[in-house]
Amino acid sequence: MRREDKSTLKNGHIDTMIKPKGRRIGLIRLSAIGDVCHAVATVQALQRHAPEDDITWIIGRTEAALIADLPGITFVIFDKKQGLKGFREVLKAIPAPFDVLLHMQVSFRANLLAAVVPAKIKWGFPKNLSKELHGLAINRRVPMPETPHVLEGFQHFAYALGVPAFTPKWSIPIPQ
């Protein structure tokens, strides 16, 4: 039986997740260009809070083309057109298990991927926002409002890692 963390928010943070910096953080947000752009604000808040953390973003091919020039992030491309080979390619590109995986998507394909990506802690959405077997791919649920805007929901993933409340900021380099 899966044991879920019962942590609660204290001062805007998950009290059990405030850890030393220098973590290997994985993130899954494969698709939906608008949602990927919202996730950028959360990733950049994580970078400002803990620049020593190593962030790897597992992302779709089209979405990666939009944000591939973001500094300080390793991108692993998931090509859904490759089927099972796409899953194997992602796993080959991850050199070691993540300390933390932020599973920021509830599609069936993303849930399958999160289930096989190695990580000690896998944060996902609360039950009311989960679907397509999301709960089977995670071992902790991020507390958040009942019906958050996508951007607000993503911010709560950063709070779970000890980032204090922040105003979203985007800095997306545009190639010449």
Task: Mark where each language-model region is.
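Catalytic machinery of carbohydrate-active enzymes
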Residues: M1-Q176
